[in-house]
C-alpha cells in the first residue's frame, strides 16, 4: 500500500498520482462518491462503477448507529456487505457528531452524543471509532476529530486542535496494537481559518509517520475566498510524497481549483443531493429539470455527455418523471451528475498530463460560472482575481 506521484504540473501544485490500497489502485486526482449508509443513493454498485468511480466513501457514524459494526462484520466486512469490491474510505463520524447529533459533550476521553435518529446516548472515543472501522474493513480510515464551524474563536479552535491531535495519537496507538496493517490511517488537519494553528497541526503530524493527510474543518460555512486561501496555505505545508484529501468538498469549480492547489482526493454529497432536488450539471452551470422550458425539450441533459441517462432519455421525459415524483428520475439525474464530475476529473487529469491545466482551468471556470445563475459565488471579484 503506497502513494506514487507520477507527474507534476509545471505551473501549479497539481499532480497525477496512484494510490495503492488493499482493494485496488486509485488514480488521482480523484472524486469519491458518498455512500453514507453503504450505498450511493438511488444507484447500484454496478452503476456507480459504470459512471467511473474507483473508490467510494461511507460514514462511520451512520453505520455505527445502523445496522451496527457487528452486523457488517458478520456479513464479511463492508465490501462484501454492500457488494463493492473496490477501495472504500470511511470517515470517522466526527463531523456528523457535530452537525447532526444532539446534546453532545466533549471530554478528554471522547464525545457524548445523542443519536439524531432516536435520541439514544452514545460515547465515541478514538479507540471505539478505530474499532468500528476495523470491523468495517475499509481501506482508508479516519481518526475521531473535532470539527468546528466557521467563526469559531482562536482559543476555541486551538483547544479543539489540541484534543484532535491527542486523539490522533491514541488512534495511531490503537491501530499499531490491533492488526490493522491493511488499512491506511490519514491524519485530519484541523485549525479552523487560523494559519498559525494549521501550521502547528501539520508540523506535529509530520512526526507521526502518517500515510496521508486530510484537510478537515473546511466548507463549514465560510466564504469561497476563505476556503481557497486556507486550503492553498495548508497544502503548501504538506510533504510532496503523501496524498492530500480535501474533506466534504466537491462542487465542479472547487474540484478544479483544489486540484490546482495540489489536492489529490475529494468527496461530497452534492451531486447526489442536487439530483434528488431536480438539479443537474452542465458545462455552462447548474440547471433545474423542473423548469417549464424543458417541457417540450427532447434533447439530452447535455449533448456531449456519454452517461446512460444522456444516451437514452430526454429532458422532457426526465422532467415528466420528476414532476410525478417517480424515483427513476432521481436515479437518472444522479447518474448524470456523477458522470459529469468523473468526466471533469478525466479532463483535469488529461490536462495535467498534457501540461495545460492552467488553460483548462480558465476555460472551464469562465464557461461554467459565467452562466451559472443558480450557483453564484458570494463575491465575483474573487474569481476575477483567481483567473488572472
From Swiss-Prot:
Its EC number is 2.4.2.29. PANTHER family: QUEUINE TRNA-RIBOSYLTRANSFERASE. Pfam families: TGT. Pathway: tRNA modification; tRNA-queuosine biosynthesis. GO terms for molecular function: metal ion binding; tRNA-guanosine(34) queuine transglycosylase activity. GO terms for cellular component: cytosol. Zn(2+) binds at residues 305, 307, 310, 336. InterPro entries: ArchSynthase1/Queuine_TRR, TGT, TGT-like_sf, tRNA_ribo_trans-like. Residues 248-254, 272-276 are annotated as: RNA binding. This is Queuine tRNA-ribosyltransferase. Its cofactor is Zn(2+). Binds 1 zinc ion per subunit.
Amino acid at each position: 500500500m503506497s502513494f506514487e506521484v507520477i507527474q507534476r504540473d509545471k505551473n501549479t501544485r497539481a499532480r497525477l498520482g496512484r494510490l495503492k490500497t488493499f482493494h485496488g489502485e486509485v488514480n488521482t486526482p480523484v472524486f469519491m462518491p458518498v455512500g453514507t449508509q453503504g450505498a450511493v443513493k438511488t444507484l447500484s454498485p454496478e452503476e456507480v462503477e459504470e459512471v467511473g468511480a474507483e473508490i467510494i466513501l461511507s460514514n462511520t457514524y451512520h453505520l455505527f448507529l445502523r445496522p451496527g459494526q457487528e452486523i457488517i462484520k458478520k456479513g464479511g466486512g463492508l465490501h462484501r456487505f454492500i457488494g463493492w469490491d473496490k477501495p472504500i474510505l470511511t470517515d470517522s463520524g466526527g463531523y456528523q457528531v457535530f452537525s447532526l447529533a444532539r446534546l453532545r459533550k466533549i471530554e478528554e476521553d471522547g464525545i457524548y452524543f445523542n443519536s439524531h435518529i432516536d435520541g439514544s446516548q452514545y460515547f465515541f472515543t478514538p479507540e471505539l471509532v478505530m474499532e468500528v472501522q476495523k470491523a468495517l474493513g475499509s481501506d482508508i480510515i479516519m481518526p475521531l476529530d473535532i470539527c468546528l464551524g466557521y467563526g469559531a474563536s482562536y482559543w476555541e479552535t486551538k483547544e479543539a486542535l489540541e484534543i484532535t491531535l491527542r486523539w490522533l495519537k491514541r488512534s495511531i496507538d490503537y491501530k499499531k496494537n490491533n492488526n490493522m496493517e491493511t488499512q491506511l490511517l490519514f491524519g485530519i488537519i484541523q485549525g479552523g481559518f487560523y494559519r498559525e494553528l494549521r501550521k502547528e497541526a501539520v508540523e506535529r503530524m509530520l512526526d507521526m509517520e502518517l500515510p496521508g493527510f486530510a484537510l478537515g474543518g473546511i466548507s463549514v460555512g465560510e466564504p469561497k475566498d476563505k476556503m481557497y486561501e486556507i486550503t492553498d496555505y495548508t497544502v503548501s505545508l504538506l510533504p510532496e510524497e503523501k496524498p492530500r484529501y480535501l474533506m466534504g468538498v466537491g462542487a465542479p469549480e472547487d474540484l478544479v481549483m483544489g486540484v490546482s492547489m495540489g489536492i489529490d482526493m475529494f468527496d461530497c454529497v452534492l451531486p447526489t443531493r442536487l439530483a434528488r432536488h431536480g438539479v443537474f450539471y452542465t458545462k455552462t452551470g447548474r440547471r433545474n429539470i423542473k423548469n417549464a422550458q424543458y417541457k417540450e425539450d427532447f434533447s439530452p441533459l447535455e449533448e456531449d455527455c456519454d452517461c446512460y441517462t444522456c444516451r437514452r432519455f430526454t429532458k422532457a421525459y426526465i422532467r415528466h418523471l420528476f414532476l410525478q415524483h417517480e424515483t427513476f428520475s432521481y436515479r437518472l439525474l444522479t447518474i448524470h451528475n456523477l458522470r459529469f464530475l468523473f468526466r471533469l476529473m478525466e479532463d483535469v487529469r488529461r490536462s495535467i498530463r498534457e501540461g495545460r491545466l492552467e488553460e483548462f482551468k480558465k476555460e472551464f471556470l469562465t464557461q461554467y460560472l459565467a452562466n451559472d445563475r443558480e450557483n453564484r459565488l458570494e463575491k465575483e471579484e474573487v474569481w476575477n482575481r483567481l483567473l488572472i
